[in-house]
């Protein structure tokens, strides 16, 4: 995964539809929830109140029967020109499990949305004695396969 460095990132405020995420890798050798190339759920990310290298974010999952949501508790963005990497910390509810996650989204901003998007998710804390969601400290990598995460008007 490319981390776009720099202290002059583009303004990424807006709503983006991540609707073509494909699984690439997991750090957990026992994680069999996905195999390479499997599609992931669709997400809508909302970035707002960007001030320099700080930005706020929320997300929700758009999948029938799944009501995952998260509220950002802090985000830092790096990059320069149109390329950026945003480091997000969320309080989330995933498949009914309260948890905290850290997400990295890296890509290039265009007038249509975000191209070359890579999405990394790790859970840092969870209330999940049944291990319904991924293990704490492991991570999964997804790519927005052969398309742009389109900018949206409604969250």
Task: Show the residue positions of the predicted features.
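Glycine-rich, aromatic-bearing surface loops/beta-hairpins
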Residues: 97-155
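Generic short beta-strand segments
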Residues: 15-26, 58-62, 85-93, 102, ...
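Short coil-to-beta strand junction motifs in C2/discoidin
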Residues: 36-42
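Amphipathic/hydrophobic helical signal segments and adjacent flexible N-terminal regions
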Residues: 1-34, 146-155
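Contiguous, well-ordered beta-strand patches that form the walls/edges
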Residues: 45-112
């Amino acid at each position: 995964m490319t981390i776009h460095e720099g202290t002059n990132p583009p303004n990424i405020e807006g709503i983006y539809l991540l609707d073509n995420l494909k699984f690439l890798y997991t750090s957990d050798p026992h994680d069999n929830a996905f195999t390479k190339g499997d599609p992931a759920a669709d997400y809508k990310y909302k970035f707002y109140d960007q001030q320099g290298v700080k930005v706020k974010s929320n997300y929700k999952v758009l999948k029938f029967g799944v009501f995952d949501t998260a509220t950002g508790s802090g985000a830092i963005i790096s990059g320069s020109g149109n390329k950026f990497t945003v480091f997000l910390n969320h309080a989330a509810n995933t498949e009914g499990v309260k948890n905290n996650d850290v997400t990295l989204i890296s890509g290039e901003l265009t007038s249509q949305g975000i191209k070359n998007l890579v999405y990394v998710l790790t859970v840092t804390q969870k209330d999940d004695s049944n291990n319904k969601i991924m293990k704490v400290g492991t991570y999964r990598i997804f790519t927005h396969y052969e398309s742009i995460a389109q900018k949206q008007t409604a969250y």
